[in-house]
Amino acid sequence: MSGDPGLEALKARVAEVPLGPEIEETGRIATLADGLVEVEGLPGARLGEVVRFAGGAEGLVLTLDPETVQVALLDPGAALGSGTEVRRTGQLLSVPVGQGLLGRVVDPLGRPLDGLPAILPEARLEIERPAPGIVDRDMVAEPVETGLLVVDALFAVGRGQRELIIGERATGKTSLAVDAIVNQAASDIVCFYVAIGQRTTAVRRVIETVREKGAFARTVFVVAPATASPGLRWIAPFAATSMAEWVRDRGGHALIVYDDLTKHAAVHRELALLARQPPGREAYPGDIFYLHARLLERSAKLSAVNGGGSLTALPIAEIEAGNLSAYIPTNLISIADGQIVTSAALFAANQRPAVDIGLSVSRVGGKAQRGALKAVAGRVRLDYAQYLEMKMFSRFGGFGDAALRARLARGERIGALLAQPRTTPLSTPVQVALLAALAEGALDDVPLEDLARLKAALGPVLAADASLGPFRAAPDRLEPETRAALLACVRRAREAP
């Protein structure tokens, strides 16, 4: 009998059965206020651990005190009160990840908000994960093409970069990010849009825009609206980043938009004050910089040894009265790899996108730009900045010098070229053709009001030119014959009805 394989297997299974006592650590709610619970009696609790209340509601351990634990509620509708039993789960908070999230609208825990069946995850990842180390990263050298001429030509965003979009309320910050998502409809980049504390109607508009433009199937929407509990709003960017990291860690490419981190900082302050943490500048707790640094550092371009995937971040921040030197904006600017600043004055002047050329910058820039675009975009920013300065001084008197008048006229054309309606992306070949024509003076006699029609007509003309097929597929070099063909296309587009 001792040699019976079935008996040996049974013995092995019996040996794995734990025979000792099962120990559960429980506590009780001491106080409950505004989505934060103070629990007594969980001495072994860990930061980030999930606890379960009587009735099934869950919470997240945020702070540890000598006698109590502060827990953020993740189920705001739960019926809880003083004395309710709380149990440790021993597990850190995790979220579902996988292809099943594509084209779905979920809350930060991965629960559907779109009325469709539950997500079937391929795995689960903890919401707090370490950022890739230095040796695990690669240089940011591939572009994320947004389809916006002002961004792709002047402030190029690379795969693995963190480019902050910052400006006053209602100046087109979300529109910039949504345009970048829409332009990925036919690319290999998976997009994640994270709504933190936004109005439900605003989130619905974003979702419908992405759906109408054909990018919905490759986008994941993680929504924690203003009506969600503070705990859900707090975990939203971390949970969505873990979902996006699953794509990156398998060699894929992801783009994540945080809309917005100013509201995330506000909910962090709210929870910290409820937990009686010492307030610092503007009543934010002392770890506010670390909060966003550890979040944004998770966006990276991985080395080939680690799969070569990338996670690009477009965090959004709101400022008041144009004050870029406020606490949260300066924190985010110092963490990110550059910023795109939207201007209320430009927005009021009907300039779309309302990007302030002088205050915006990309610390990666040309390193991640297509070679052909880099070749023709070199002087555009300088010329436009000089035009804005001369335009300001021209209010005090006319310019008699013909050369100065020509520079003013050129600057006006640059501004008209950079103007772009929402969700009308321009391909890289079209951008190269426009900037090459500008550099050659081929647009100097085009009336400003006709430039919008020219941009719309140029795409089909380029697509119909068979000689530009290789360039359309890989616009990395601008050979003389290619430049000539592009200029010929611009001339044909000018003549188009």
Curated annotation (Swiss-Prot):
This is ATP synthase subunit alpha 2. Belongs to the ATPase alpha/beta chains family. Keywords: ATP synthesis, ATP-binding, Cell inner membrane, Cell membrane, CF(1), Hydrogen ion transport, Ion transport, Membrane, Nucleotide-binding, Plasmid, Translocase, Transport. The record marks S360 as: Required for activity. GO terms for cellular component: plasma membrane; proton-transporting ATP synthase complex. It comes from Cereibacter sphaeroides (strain ATCC 17023 / DSM 158 / JCM 6121 / CCUG 31486 / LMG 2827 / NBRC 12203 / NCIMB 8253 / ATH 2.4.1.) (Rhodobacter sphaeroides). Its EC number is 7.1.2.2. It holds the Pfam family ATP-synt_ab_C. It catalyses: ATP + H2O + 4 H(+)(in) = ADP + phosphate + 5 H(+)(out). HAMAP family: ATP_synth_alpha_bact. ATP binds at G167, E168, R169, A170, T171, G172, K173, T174. Produces ATP from ADP in the presence of a proton gradient across the membrane. The alpha chain is a regulatory subunit. It is an enzyme of class 7 (translocase). F-type ATPases have 2 components, CF(1) - the catalytic core - and CF(0) - the membrane proton channel. CF(1) has five subunits: alpha(3), beta(3), gamma(1), delta(1), epsilon(1). CF(0) has four main subunits: a(1), b(1), b'(1) and c(9-12). InterPro entries: ATP_synth_asu-like_sf (IPR023366), ATP_synth_asu_C (IPR000793), ATP_synth_asu_C_sf (IPR038376), ATP_synth_F1_a_nt-bd_dom (IPR033732), ATP_synth_F1_asu (IPR005294), ATPase_a/bsu_AS (IPR020003), ATPase_F1/V1/A1_a/bsu_N_sf (IPR036121), ATPase_F1/V1/A1_a/bsu_nucl-bd (IPR000194). It is a peripheral membrane protein. It is found in: Cell inner membrane. PANTHER family: ATP SYNTHASE SUBUNIT ALPHA, MITOCHONDRIAL. GO terms for molecular function: ADP binding; ATP binding; proton-transporting ATP synthase activity, rotational mechanism. The gene is atpA2.
